[in-house]
Amino acid sequence: MKKKKIIFYSLMFLPLIVVLIALHFLPERIPAHYDFNNQVTRWGSKYETLIFPVITVLFGYFMLGMAKFSSKQEENGSNNENVCIVAGIVSLTLFNAMIGYFLYADFNSIENLSSIALDINQLLFGLLGVAMIILGNI
């Protein structure tokens, strides 16, 4: 369980650390919103990239709270806590992949997401498939 919590905390704080480092190298104006045709509809400040890592940290603490709460519901053992921690690890991995994708788009000021070889939908649905396999085997 200790090893899983180390992985959990690493995945929880890694995006914040990476974005804080990348902030110095990002252009002042980055694409902040895309429409359904993958075209930029709004440009924003580079500091807007901090929003998603902060949400990731808050989500991580929420999952830790749920793990503690669920462990109290179980009389003996820690299966509920284990499931919550693993679900949190899988979810945080998805968040990290999304943040990496968005940072790549921000660094290159990509105006059309269709020009990136790996589509965000392919990435997320592929990772969701792997997540379902992992969660189904707990």
Could you say what each language-model-derived stretch is?
Residues 2-30, 34-138:
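Feature 926 captures the class I aminoacyl-tRNA synthetase adenylation module centered on the KMSKS loop
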